[in-house]
Amino acid sequence: MINSTIAKRYALSLVQLGAECGLVDRFRGELADVEDLFGTTPEIPAAFADPALSHERKKNIMRELVGSCACSELMGNFLLLLVDKNRVAFFSQIVKAYGQLADEHVGILRPVITTAFELDAVQLAAIREALEKKSAKTIIPQLTVDKAFLGGVVVQIGDTVYDSSVKTQLKRIQDQLQKG
């Protein structure tokens, strides 16, 4: 809980800065580039976690990362702030929180849509239209197929779940019959 609070605080500050400067999308790309380096080079996060490395050495490593990713000056300053505040360990959580907050800022929802089979373009468009109408936001769905489903669709947007699966409908009918 504390970790996610820290990550959200830093991500929110970065989204606000990005909004002021018109760089929300650029920051998203720069964060993704740095996160890719962290993921593909395990020595990088290990270096920031190493208490034997001096603070100045860690800042130099971050400066090298910023240079190799061609990050903006603002992003570079943000990443150096993470080093100064000893928050680099929260970087992946900050990136995730930034993505969510940036999406919210620009009016994007990324629902997870689960079905028993692959949706065709018409079905997907109908679901997307309904969600856009209900939410008044742009919908970028993540599609998953669960062969355990009998049929129907489950849409999850954040903590909200819209469940129109056959299993849930059968359960409702069973509950109504038992109530008599």
UniProtKB/Swiss-Prot annotation:
A Pfam match is: OSCP
Keyword Hydrolase in the entry? The reply is no
- According to Swiss-Prot or TrEMBL, what is its membrane topology? Peripheral membrane protein
GO molecular function list: proton-transporting ATP synthase activity, rotational mechanism
Q: Which domain of life is it from?
A: Bacteria
Recorded hits in InterPro entries, A to Z, give:
ATP_synth_OSCP/delta_N_sf, ATPase_OSCP/dsu
Identify the keywords attached in UniProt to this record, alphabetized.
ATP synthesis, Cell inner membrane, Cell membrane, CF(1), Hydrogen ion transport, Ion transport, Membrane, Transport
Q: What does this protein do?
A: F(1)F(0) ATP synthase produces ATP from ADP in the presence of a proton or sodium gradient. F-type ATPases consist of two structural domains, F(1) containing the extramembraneous catalytic core and F(0) containing the membrane proton channel, linked together by a central stalk and a peripheral stalk. During catalysis, ATP synthesis in the catalytic domain of F(1) is coupled via a rotary mechanism of the central stalk subunits to proton translocation.
What assembly does the database describe for this protein? F-type ATPases have 2 components, F(1) - the catalytic core - and F(0) - the membrane proton channel. F(1) has five subunits: alpha(3), beta(3), gamma(1), delta(1), epsilon(1). F(0) has three main subunits: a(1), b(2) and c(10-14). The alpha and beta chains form an alternating ring which encloses part of the gamma chain. F(1) is attached to F(0) by a central stalk formed by the gamma and epsilon chains, while a peripheral stalk is formed by the delta and b chains.
**Protein name, please?**
ATP synthase subunit delta
Organism for this UniProt entry: Pelobacter propionicus (strain DSM 2379 / NBRC 103807 / OttBd1)
